[in-house]
Amino acid sequence: MALETTPWNVQDHLQTPEECVLYLEAVFEEARDDPAFIAKAIGDVARARGMTQTARAAGISREGLYKALSEEGNPSFGTVLKVLTALGLRLQVELEAT
């Protein structure tokens, strides 16, 4: 008998701002050396919160935002900061545990 599975979409699990923050914190912790993965994760949050609204608030075209935050995208640091601000988030720096 074949095992039946259902598609899993991360955006379905990013319903609150707190869930979005926890998701991005985990991504930054686990994939700190993978900018493409981090950009895609920010894109996941933007899609969960509404890509059109996020793009408008960031001052970026919707298509440009999809492209920048895709797996093949390579957003500028400025774009990342604009998107985080549009999502009501901010980048925070802390000391690495030694």
Go through each PLM region and give its residues:
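Amphipathic alpha-helical interface surfaces
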Residues: C20, D34, I38, I42, ...
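Short alpha-helical DNA-recognition segment
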Residues: R47-K67
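Short, charged recognition helix plus adjacent turn
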Residues: L3, Q92-T98
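DNA major-groove recognition helix of helix-turn-helix/homeodomain DNA-binding modules
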Residues: S76-E94
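Extended, folded domain segments that form the structural surfaces/walls around functional sites
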Residues: L22-E25, L65-K67, P75
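Alpha-solenoid HEAT/Armadillo repeat architecture
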Residues: H13, F28-E29, R47, S70-G73
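N-terminal flexible/basic segments that precede or flank functional cores
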Residues: M1-A41
